[in-house]
Amino acid sequence: MATINQLVRKPRKRMVDKSDVPALQNCPQRRGVCTRVYTTTPKKPNSALRKVCRVRLTNGFEVSSYIGGEGHNLQEHSVVLIRGGRVKDLPGVRYHTVRGSLDTSGVKDRKQGRSKYGAKRPK
């Protein structure tokens, strides 16, 4: 326990909280261009081919972003919108692509949870 005199001489340090999504620079989303679209395998207990793209953002950052949903139309030079949100079983993937905006199509034949995948309401 510090004495009052010690605290007068040297006040307590404030804790600085580190951002989980530094490339967004306090913005809700960021636009970027795909530099590489590929699949990768998840960490130990899980097994799949997860769809991921490498994106060069408008602020100069280059990040890996997960493409959610079944099937996608992304290729190199596609313009995408990136939001925060990591993928727990893919190390280094801390962003998600927003489906149904810019060059990213929505998920086809999606009936439930449509807003998360940019799918229109079925007639």
Curated annotation (Swiss-Prot):
GO terms for biological process: translation. The modification 3-methylthioaspartic acid is found at residue 89. Residues 100-123 are annotated as: Disordered. The keyword Ribosomal protein applies. The keyword Ion transport does not apply. Keywords: Methylation, Ribonucleoprotein, Ribosomal protein, RNA-binding, rRNA-binding, tRNA-binding. Disulfide bonds: none annotated. One of its GO terms (cellular component) is ribosome. InterPro entries: NA-bd_OB-fold, Ribosomal_uS12, Ribosomal_uS12_bac. Residues 113-123 have a biased composition (Basic residues). GO terms for molecular function: rRNA binding; structural constituent of ribosome; tRNA binding. With S4 and S5 plays an important role in translational accuracy. Belongs to the universal ribosomal protein uS12 family. Part of the 30S ribosomal subunit. Contacts proteins S8 and S17. May interact with IF1 in the 30S initiation complex. PANTHER family: 30S RIBOSOMAL PROTEIN S12 FAMILY MEMBER. NCBIfam families: rpsL_bact. This is Small ribosomal subunit protein uS12. It comes from Pseudomonas aeruginosa (strain ATCC 15692 / DSM 22644 / CIP 104116 / JCM 14847 / LMG 12228 / 1C / PRS 101 / PAO1). The lineage of its organism: Bacteria, Pseudomonadati, Pseudomonadota, Gammaproteobacteria, Pseudomonadales. The gene is rpsL.
